[in-house]
């Protein structure tokens, strides 16, 4: 609702928060596509924003050096003649590798992450998701113009690129500038790629 006010949008504008941490932007993007296709509205604004410094434990050197604050946004338009977004969504809640203890009780607390477990999970999950999306769309790695990876860890990105033989000019890293900005990570990458002219109308992008 703050955005509706600040942007002076009509009162029938649909505004809501979606909290899904690092997957937040992807969930929001898919949700926006569903909303646009189910209504007569033409455009949607998807924003990924994080202020992780508020919940960072600055005494935990294994965690505090990883995260950063950031925000990015994209305008989404859906047309009948355009292909829809082919999304693979899911969750893995059996092992609390990344958590903010006390949140469920409304107690202010700081973020905690088991870095080794998260790394091992991501190294397996990223290729799995790539395989699923390519299989769903009937495309190959060569058909993809650009790969937009969540900027959580440079090694995870490099391992995925090595596994699929993705050339350096087809993926991008900015984690060295901002750290892991969670839900803001992907729109920040998209914004920089757009500014550089790397992706544009008609680009086939795997996020």
Go through the PLM ranges and name each one:
Residues 1-9, 45-52, 99-105, 156-167:
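Acidic-glycine-rich active-site phosphate/pyrophosphate-binding loop
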Residues 125-136, 159, 163, 189:
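Phosphate/ATP-binding catalytic cores across multiple sugar-kinase/actin-like superfamilies
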Residues 10-12, 18-40, 145-207:
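Claisen-condensing/thiolase-fold acyl-transfer catalytic domains that form or cleave C-C bonds
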Residues 58-124, 128-131, 204:
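Condensing-enzyme catalytic core mediating Claisen C-C bond formation in acyl metabolism
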Residues 24-27, 52-56, 93-95:
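Short, well-ordered, mixed-charge alpha-helical segments that flank or form enzyme active sites
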Residues 19, 43-50, 76-77, 88, ...:
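Short beta-strand segments
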Residues 35-70:
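Flexible, glycine-rich active-site loops centered on histidine and acidic residues
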Residues 128-145, 193-198:
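Phosphate/pyrophosphate-binding loops at sites that engage ATP/ADP/AMP, CoA/4′-phosphopantetheine
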